[in-house]
Amino acid sequence: QKFCTLDIAPVCCQIVIGGGMYTAGNACMCEGFVSGVGRCENPKECPCTREAQIPSCCSSRWGLVSVTGKCACDCLGGTVAFPEPCPSPY
């Protein structure tokens, strides 16, 4: 559980480990990881602003991708393969 305030706005959220960004109103609304303060350069419209940050492995058209929750996986048009990060390919 992280403490946060509602005075940081906007922030750029990374919904997918390794890519996939969207702009949130503030850090408290970021479903993924805050990658920077301010709007994303290439924001992805995505309603993933209220979901708990639960790492999941998402089966998408790019293969298995680690994401921060089911909503982020849905944003990729994928389905959750299992509720933990994907195994590393290395």
From Swiss-Prot:
The N-terminus is blocked. The keyword Disulfide bond applies. The modification Pyrrolidone carboxylic acid is found at Q1. One of its GO terms (molecular function) is carbohydrate binding. The keyword Isomerase does not apply. Keywords: Disulfide bond, Hemagglutinin, Lectin, Pyrrolidone carboxylic acid. Disulfide bonds join C46-C71. Lectin with specificity for complex N-linked glycans and O-linked glycans. Has hemagglutinating activity towards rabbit erythrocytes. This is Lectin-1.
